């Protein structure tokens, strides 16, 4: 049954009409050209990622150029298997990340599970959110602010140590380390990226496909992640794949939240009375308006600095229609939210170069 599903999925992608019209801002979907643009940005910013070709010309898809059929990063560590500490515990169920514009009665299928860490992690995250405050010019701490506050610079995030998720002290494990090769392909049917994972017990010993499910969170094993042949390789190489049916709606949610947060920042900058006050606004790192997986992302497009000028002057002249996340930054955000499916795999390792 799984073989039939994999075959049908492959042919559906290859036979679906190719969209050349950008609907990135309105639907969260991207065209093949935008996928290549986003892939080029990912490879440029994070050299652990690279473009790759299909194993043979017959395996290529016509809507992507030769040599840029998919993206790959190799040897990503996974130090621990997932258990109840990741999948949640009694009294603390996994949350659904909903579209910010939909009501409380929205169908759960319209959202994305926010998982990992159980009650303890959730409480710690809540405490961190409560600690976010503003400070006035006199140094007085203000009241807690509403969600969707400020967005950090994307260009400044590359060297931000706080953006890297690290193993908490005292939480070491004796479980054998696995490594994964991660592949990002383009789903022509859903018009979104799609992630495939191939695991290894050692550099020369592939991980049996069914054991990859030990590194997948809870309900995803049945609802979202399946074992399928990788369409770009000959020989039927079985991998775990995160189904893309909800990717567009989740990305649209993140885009909307980031834009709303950027608008709040821009409004605060307009009300700033000095460059120092503007710099304090820009230095704030609250990201409550986005899902936790996007913490530390660079979500603000920079226009560049005039000679002798500072960021205050540049941001004062931003266009009102400026967006928080450009289409070429799509895959960076995509990887941040997709990490919720496999929190044991150190996705940030791929962004540490």
UniProtKB/Swiss-Prot annotation:
Location(s), subcellular: Cytoplasm
PANTHER family attached to this UniProt entry: UBIQUITIN-LIKE-CONJUGATING ENZYME ATG3
This protein's name: Autophagy-related protein 3
Region (Flexible region): 85-174
Gene Ontology annotations of biological process type: autophagosome assembly; autophagy of mitochondrion; glycophagy; nucleophagy; piecemeal microautophagy of the nucleus; protein targeting to membrane; protein transport
This protein's domain notes: The flexible region (FR) is required for atg7-binding. The handle region (HR) contains the atg8 interaction motif (AIM) and mediates binding to atg8. It is crucial for the cytoplasm-to-vacuole targeting pathway.
Region (Handle region): 249-329
Region (Disordered), start-end ranges: 107-156
Main localization, broad class: cytoplasm
Sorted UniProt keywords: Autophagy, Cytoplasm, Protein transport, Transport, Ubl conjugation pathway
Organism expressing this protein natively: Aspergillus fumigatus (strain ATCC MYA-4609 / CBS 101355 / FGSC A1100 / Af293)
């Amino acid at each position: 049954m799984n073989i039939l599903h994999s075959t049908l999925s492959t042919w559906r992608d290859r036979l679906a009409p190719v969209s050349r019209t950008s609907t990135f801002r309105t639907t969260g979907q991207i065209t093949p050209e935008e996928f290549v643009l986003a892939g080029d940005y990912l490879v440029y910013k994070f050299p652990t990622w690279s473009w790759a070709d299909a194993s043979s010309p017959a395996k290529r898809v016509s809507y992507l150029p030769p040599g840029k059929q998919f993206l790959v990063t190799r040897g990503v560590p996974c130090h621990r298997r997932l258990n109840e500490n990741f999948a949640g515990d009694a009294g603390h169920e996994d949350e659904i990340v909903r579209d910010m514009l939909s009501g409380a009665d929205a169908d759960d299928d319209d959202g994305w599970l926010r998982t990992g860490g159980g009650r303890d992690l959730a409480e710690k995250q809540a405490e961190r959110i409560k600690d976010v405050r503003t400070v006035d010019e006199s140094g007085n701490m203000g009241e807690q602010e509403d969600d969707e506050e400020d967005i950090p610079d994307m260009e400044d995030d590359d060297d931000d140590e706080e953006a890297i998720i690290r193993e908490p002290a005292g939480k070491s494990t004796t479980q054998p380390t696995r490594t994964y090769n991660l592949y990002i392909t383009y789903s022509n049917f859903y018009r979104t990226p799609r992630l495939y994972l191939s695991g290894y017990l050692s550099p020369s010993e592939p991980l049996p496909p069914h054991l990859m499910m030990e590194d997948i969170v809870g309900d995803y094993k049945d609802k979202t992640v399946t074992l399928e042949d990788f369409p770009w390789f000959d020989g039927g190489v079985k991998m775990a794949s995160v189904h893309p049916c909800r990717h567009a709606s989740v990305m649209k949610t993140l885009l909307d939240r980031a834009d709303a947060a950027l608008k709040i920042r821009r409004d605060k900058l307009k009300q700033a009375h000095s460059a120092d006050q503007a710099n304090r606004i820009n230095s704030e790192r609250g990201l409550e308006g986005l899902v936790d997986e996007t913490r530390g992302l660079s979500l603000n497009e920079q226009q560049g600095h005039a000679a002798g000028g500072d960021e205050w002057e540049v941001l004062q002249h931003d266009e009102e229609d400026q967006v928080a996340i450009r289409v070429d930054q799509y895959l960076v955000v995509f990887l941040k939210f997709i990490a919720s499916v496999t929190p044991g795999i150190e996705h940030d390792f791929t962004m540490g170069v």
